[in-house]
Regions:
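A structural motif corresponding to the C-terminal end of an alpha-helix
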Residues: 60-71, 102-114, 165, 169, ...
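Conserved C-terminal guanine-recognition region of P-loop GTPase G domains, centered on the G4
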Residues: 19-111
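Short linear functional motifs in flexible/disordered or boundary regions
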Residues: 40-43, 128, 174, 178
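C-terminal accessory extensions appended to soluble enzyme cores
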Residues: 142-232
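Switch II (G3) loop of P-loop NTPases
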Residues: 1-18
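Canonical P-loop GTPase G-domain recognition
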Residues: 74, 82-169
Length: 232
């Protein structure tokens, strides 16, 4: 199951909303933190906290360590076309590393693996500029985009990478799990392993897909590692 929810839900005053989010995260295999890249990179990052809710995300995860301990977290910068074309994807990853340092320090203390996996969302357009927003309650500025060439085409890039990282984590966790004492095994993966352990062919096919992981190039970098995930 894949579930998306806005950052505002993390500070919801409705108890059932908070409990729903916590329970979903506690039973998740991987947590994706989407990053609107132009807000991260442009105008000195002035509007980054407002758009990407950096403090809210950081404090929520730190306050709910039991839901994320021993897991995989992917920071996924979106709308990276401009930075790919300008050869600046590594700068995007370094900015993520700098911006979320408090959170990744926390990850390092709690056996949480984290990586940056930038995505080229559309491919045919790229960021151009920021303009004032006229929508009440919206962020102060909105992104303006332009065509990348005369005949822009829909050409997303790197979109399967979060899935490849997820599969890598699942296969690594399965192998790690077999070495643990029964009382130490977490329950959040049980439903997945109930069929993996009985289908070795399926498991081997999953392992083959992990070879497509992009690592240490094109802005794909590790931020923290843990005792479970292994990427060559």
């Amino acid at each position: 199951t894949i579930r998306d929810f806005p950052g505002e839900y993390l500070t919801s005053t409705i108890k059932s909303d908070r409990e729903d989010i916590y329970n979903f995260m506690a039973n998740a295999t991987v947590i994706l933190i989407a990053v609107d890249t132009p807000y991260l990179m442009e105008e000195g990052g002035r509007y980054n906290a407002e758009k990407n809710k950096v403090d809210i995300v950081t404090h929520y995860l730190k306050d709910n360590v039991a839901a994320v301990k021993d897991k995989l977290v992917l920071f996924v910068p979106l709308k990276c076309e401009r930075y790919l074309h300008d050869g600046k994807l590594p700068l995007v990853s370094e900015k993520v590393k700098e911006t979320y340092k408090e959170l990744t320090d926390f990850f390092g203390q709690n056996n949480i693996a984290s990586f940056v996996t930038p995505i080229i969302t559309l491919g045919g357009i790229e960021f151009d500029s920021m303009k004032n927003s006229n929508v009440p309650g919206d962020v102060s500025k909105v992104s303006v985009f332009r065509s990348w060439n005369v005949k822009p085409e829909y050409k997303p890039l790197f979109c399967p990478q979060p899935l490849y990282y997820l599969l890598t984590y699942v296969t690594n966790y399965y192998e790690w799990q077999k070495k643990q004492k029964k009382g130490l095994i977490d329950s959040f993966m049980d439903s997945i392993y109930s069929f993996i352990k009985n289908d070795s062919k399926f498991f081997e096919e999953m392992k083959k897909l992990t070879r497509f992981v992009i690592y240490n190039k094109n802005g794909f970098i590790p931020l923290t590692t843990n005792s479970i995930i292994k990427i060559n």
